[in-house]
Amino acid sequence: RPDSWKFVALYLLGGLAQTFLLLNIAHDSNHNAISSRPRVNKTLNYVFDLCGISSYMWRILHHRGHHSCINLHGEDDALSGRGIFRFTPYESRAPWHRFQHIYALFLYAMFSLDYVFFRDFESFFFPSHDYLKRANHSLRECAILFAGKGFYLTYMLVLPVMVLGKSPLLVAGAFLLVHLFVGLAVTLVFQTTHTIDTTYFPTDRGEFDNGVYHIFATTADYATENPLVGWLAGGLNHHIVHHLCPFVCHTHYAPLTRIVKQTAEEFGVPYRQHPTMTQAIRHHLILLKQLGNAN
């Protein structure tokens, strides 16, 4: 029916808005990069919870499980393939990894659903990393975790049925479509900056003289001269600058990237980049194919 298509279109538009909010506001506030006032950043950080993701767990996983250990096997949470993917040369290879470059995009689309229904609870109640086991979760954060999930699922699934009178099947289908889009978009924004065929996977934290060299070796930019991509990705296509200056708002990344690139060339430090996001995705899939077919 026409009304159903209108509902689905508006529902998908809402999902697109959630993606922009996550990449442009929530991520920056998580790094205290939006305002010099901590209360402002903390308040905006709850955008994660409004979108069904625990801001508390994201902060722990993203800061301790990524920024402090980029591309380190067994430490960087972004490299956790749960046996489905092989993201580093140091992970054991399984027969199905030969096809990971084929099924990757489909499973990446499940990323958002995984975070909403499983990942946050798994990290909170059944921690696997040492930094998660050492975390002393307060009762308040536990309450916010459940309240955020409940609020999100209520306005996304329950209210359209009860208030708008839409069929549960239609709402569930629209919900699935939204998360397939959000999951694929967010995953590709991040995966194309670290896990590509030209980045490096250190064996330990002390492999480089300082953290700056570590960042340059393990991180790559893409489409840095394309303002539209920068706007859509919340500046995360300028990923080297993001890791060098995580407390700087992404609206400053473009000019800073030009300075960083020039300085890297001046001191002979390799600067990795791709002119387009499409090429970055291609090189990510090349790495997956390489890791799936050889040790």
Give the positions of each predicted feature.
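Alpha-helical bilayer-embedded segments of polytopic membrane proteins, i.e.
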Residues: R1-L22, D49-I53, H101-L113, H137-V189
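Short low-complexity stretches enriched in small and charged residues
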Residues: D3, L61-G65, I144-A147, D197-T199
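Membrane-embedded catalytic scaffold of the fatty acid hydroxylase/desaturase
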Residues: L13-H137, R205-A294
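Juxtamembrane transmembrane-helix termini
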Residues: F121, F125, M162-G165, I196
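Composition- and surface-driven signal marking solvent-exposed, interaction-prone regions
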Residues: F121-E122, L169-L177, V186-T193, P202-D204, ...
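Extended hydrophobic/aromatic segments used for targeting, binding, or gating
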Residues: V161, L177-F208, L288-L291
